[in-house]
Amino acid sequence: MKYRDLRDFLAQLERQGELKRITAPVSTRLEMTEIADRVLRAGGPALLFENARHNDAPADMPVLANLFGTPRRVAWGMGADDVGALRETGELLASLREPEAPKGLRDALAKVSMLKAALWDMSPKTVRSAACQEIVWEGADVDLGRLPIQTCWPGDVAPLLAWGLVITRGPNARRQNLGIYRQQPLGPNKLIMRWLSHRGGALDFRDHAQAHPGKSFPIAVALGADPATILDAVTPVPDTLSEYQFAGLLRGSRTEVVKALGSDLSVPASAEIVLEGHLLPADDPRAVAAAVPEGANPPPATGYEMALEGPYGDHTGYYNEQDWFPVFTVDRITMRRNPIYHSTYTGKPPDEPAVLGVALNEVFVPLLRRQLPEIVDFYLPPEGCSYRLAVVSIRKQYAGHAKRVMFGLWSVLRQFMYTKFIVVVDEDIDPRDWTEVVWAMTTRMDPVRDTVLVENTPIDYLDFASPVSGLGGKMGLDATNKWPGETSREWGTPIHMDEAVKRRVDAMWDTLGL
């Protein structure tokens, strides 16, 4: 699907019957979550709440939910016709990450054409004026309370800004970083920026704090960017390519950006809303001293304004622990005329992150095959919180091969550093079919011999099951047929019906009255 911006994408969804306008008044507090969750679980359309109620009053703008509520809409957002076509997106990413030597003149010309399109033809286009800056709130006019930010779950500490595209740039970075990080409002102009230490935004901030200690760090947050740009932020785009460039490749047109009004950051020109501001040094007059609740650990000594974030209901299906994160002070809010507020919720799968995982699974397969050619297929079950459990089928070639694949998966892409469980099966097993996977595990595994346990590895900070926050164990399960050297016993022979018998029964089937 080709489109210009979010509004064009929504118009096309509506023509396809994939967008439902809701005119009844619906509250941003809990009601939207319940409605969106029921619709997502039924495989229903994206939702545009045209009469949202916020803080017991009519909201200033409509709220968009469930935009990526089905794998097909994710594929459309990435410029593909269907989920299967995302394998081609993965092939493109694999080629851009690690180009192979051309196999001949024709192949060389094709690779030159691809690189030209990626690195030159689709470089972002900077414009002087943009729709995202048609309206500007500054100074005392900045009020996050006027945005219809959802309160998703009864135990949430506050509303939650969940689809903000966070734009940063470190002092040594060749390009900007785009990331999706949740943000907790603290007041009319402050948000807690919850990013994990290994994420691009956090790394940019760390480098800035080391290079320019005591200096404020500029940030922009885009809400309602075009789908390709949003999805790029959760896709393993090569470090040599900007997310804006890759979004252009997916969309089929250059991404238009505009310089932020208060910094040198480039923001999506068609975004519905943009928040501009800084992370402030702790001694800045605008910074607020951290309030430490009784019994809580004090904030880390970063030299910057910090606050205790959470708890919030998360994609794990549980409320997460509180932790300290930097505070984003919003200097101005720019927006389009009649803006749309893009929102979501996270909860026990399936939710939008789980649906994204199903679609992005197809992108990952070619990337993994480039590093591990023996991989036949790869599956991240959505019930596993999108990334915590993986099942991979391989063409086994030697004893111990499954263990090599386990450690390869944990190392190849940053997306899998938090995968706790990896199940490796042979190519005759469909990793997407639990009946086959369980059969392989129960017939081809010895629990002692074929289980790999690794201690003290990086783990998602939201994983309260780990003994230490951010550090825990991993398990690999080798459910492949065992080769000489892995067993001293004669291995079982699978049962298969004779093909000639199957053909004879096929021929007589219609006469059997079954």
Curated annotation (Swiss-Prot):
It comes from the Bacteria. Prenylated FMN binds at I180, Y181, R182, R194, W195, L196, R199, G200. Mn(2+) binds at N177, E243. It is an enzyme of class 4 (lyase). Pfam families: UbiD, UbiD_C, UbiD_N. GO terms for molecular function: 3-octaprenyl-4-hydroxybenzoate carboxy-lyase activity; metal ion binding. Binds 1 prenylated FMN per subunit. It is found in: Cell membrane. GO terms for cellular component: cytosol; plasma membrane. It is a peripheral membrane protein. Its EC number is 4.1.1.98. The active site is at D314. Its main location: membrane. Pathway: Cofactor biosynthesis; ubiquinone biosynthesis. InterPro entries: UbiD, UbiD-like_C, UbiD-like_N, UbiD_bacteria, UbiD_Rift_dom. Keywords: Cell membrane, Decarboxylase, Flavoprotein, FMN, Lyase, Manganese, Membrane, Metal-binding, Ubiquinone biosynthesis. It catalyses: a 4-hydroxy-3-(all-trans-polyprenyl)benzoate + H(+) = a 2-(all-trans-polyprenyl)phenol + CO2. Belongs to the UbiD family. HAMAP family: UbiD (MF_01636). Catalyzes the decarboxylation of 3-octaprenyl-4-hydroxy benzoate to 2-octaprenylphenol, an intermediate step in ubiquinone biosynthesis. Homohexamer. This is 3-octaprenyl-4-hydroxybenzoate carboxy-lyase. The lineage of its organism: Bacteria, Pseudomonadati, Pseudomonadota, Betaproteobacteria, Burkholderiales. The gene is ubiD.
